[in-house]
Amino acid sequence: GRPAFELRAVLAATLSPTWGVYSGYELCENTPLKPGSEEYLDSEKYQLRPRDWDAAAQDGRTIAPLITALNEIRRRHPALHGLRNLRFHRTGNDAVIAYSKRTGPDAVVVVVNLDPHHTQEATVTLDLAELGLGGDENVPVRDELTGETYRWGRTNYVRLEPGRAPAHILHVRLPAGNASPSPQDSSQIGVSGTP
């Protein structure tokens, strides 16, 4: 259902430097072409299919606002444009994934509930050095999806509810002295490693 489409959109938009969706994904279309098939009936592979976008919005059957928000977040954060700057962080729950991307002064931490059916809680343990922070720093983070702000340090509690808050996309506000290029910047194609 819809929560699965939401979490897959967040993962695709934040893990990869490029992303896109087929028409109909925004409406959470998932009718199989035939029983057991991974291919969708209305995939536009074989036909163009008109869709009633307004009715879908009125019925709450669209994730278009989330996709719009994800695109806006990607535009604001150069760290999300990279691939080699991806770092994973520990969580206390296998149903929750946490990772970060940092490019120069821009750092983003993403935490996603991989279970589209149940609320999941976890303790996220960040590798602060990967974010350009000291071992015991506590910094403000802003959830780019909700606008809420928190203070995060090495260990952080999260509760993610499918359909309501399936993920956090956190902009880490690095202290002024921590805005130097990140170690992974030099490994990106076309980026010089010299200051």
Ranges and model annotations:
Residues R2-R8, S16, V21, Y25-P195:
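Carbohydrate-interacting/catalytic domains
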